[in-house]
């Protein structure tokens, strides 16, 4: 099965899993997705993720979703840069997400990182998504 936007598909699976109050969702594995999930885990938006091998010897990522008092921790996860329209930002011109309460994830020449880390390192890049 091919995807037009595998990152957008990952965000949809997380969003749909939280709407159904699932404990975890399964996502096809890739290094780029692992890097994004690592940032979401470090920032406290998901509990954890781990690599799972399915019966067809395909590797997938099992994401354990996080809730606070029954409500999903992620209120909004939105894809910014899409395959048909890439969005880039310089280090100086990047606004904060929800006045600093949210998070933007960027793909930079030094790897995938949060907007805060990119600002500290004075690096620009492609804005993958914003999370609040």
Where are these regions (language model features)?
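Core subunits and conserved enzymes of cellular information-processing
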Residues: 1-132
